[in-house]
Curated annotation (Swiss-Prot):
It comes from Caenorhabditis briggsae. Small GTPase involved in protein trafficking between different compartments. Modulates vesicle budding and uncoating within the Golgi complex. In its GTP-bound form, triggers the recruitment of coatomer proteins to the Golgi membrane. The hydrolysis of ARF1-bound GTP, which is mediated by ARFGAPs proteins, is required for dissociation of coat proteins from Golgi membranes and vesicles. Involved in endoplasmic reticulum dynamics during embryogenesis. Also required for adult germline function. One of its GO terms (biological process) is mitochondrion organization. Its EC number is 3.6.5.2. It is found in: Golgi apparatus membrane. It catalyses: GTP + H2O = GDP + phosphate + H(+). GTP binds at G24, L25, D26, A27, A28, G29, K30, T31, T32, N126, K127, Q128, D129, A160. It is a lipid-anchor. Residues 3-16 are annotated as: Important for the stable binding to the membranes. The keyword Cell division does not apply. Alternates between an inactive GDP-bound form and an active GTP-bound form. Activated by a guanine nucleotide-exchange factor (GEF) and inactivated by GTPase-activating protein (GAP). This is ADP-ribosylation factor 1-like 2. Belongs to the small GTPase superfamily. Arf family.
């Protein structure tokens, strides 16, 4: 009987956990975002070959964030991280108009995967501090987000170096997690 109350208590007051996969083309800002969330500071990054994983505590939720390298040669490895992913953060360099079509192809390829069918999608339209950056509405259009059916998605304009928009994105993810449990 005590176990029942223990579970109930943990459900009401305990920490929730969410497994997040963060992907996007190379140089979109994934690693900068991860460490801005984790440490609150800008770190010097090099291209990620493989992955970085960190736990980010926010609003009584423990987000385990997997930041996976985005270079074209290693994108086929993304699928090895799909299992048990509850939330997908897709990071887009809003200033890279030449590769936004490539970003859309990679995103749509991933969203077609059965293992990600229940994952919610958060798009970070990153590098908003740059003068030529596409705004969130333009990125939404270029990625074809309005065509998504049967998937919860949200786009957030961000600047990884200042942190602008990052916690608003986590707010949306935490609300999605609460609504599903």
């Amino acid at each position: 009987m005590g176990n029942v109350f223990g579970s109930l208590f943990k459900g009401l007051f305990g920490k929730k956990e969410m497994r997040i996969l963060m992907v996007g083309l190379d140089a979109a800002g994934k690693t900068t975002i991860l460490y801005k969330l984790k440490l609150g500071e800008i770190v010097t990054t090099i291209p990620t070959i493989g992955f970085n994983v960190e736990t980010v505590e926010y609003k009584n939720i423990s987000f385990t964030v997997w930041d996976v390298g985005g270079q074209d040669k290693i994108r086929p490895l993304w699928r090895h991280y799909f299992q048990n992913t509850q939330g997908l953060i897709f990071v887009v360099d809003s200033n890279d108009r030449e590769r936004v079509g490539e970003a859309r192809e990679e995103l749509m390829r991933m969203l077609a995967e059965d293992e990600l069918r229940d994952a919610v999608l958060l798009v970070f339209a990153n590098k908003q501090d740059l003068p030529q950056a596409m705004n969130a509405a333009e990125v939404t259009d270029k990625l074809g987000l309005h065509s998504l059916r049967n998937r919860s998605w949200y786009i957030q304009a961000t600047c990884a170096t200042s942190g602008d928009g990052l916690y608003e994105g986590l707010d949306w993810l935490s609300n999605q997690l609460k609504n599903r449990s």
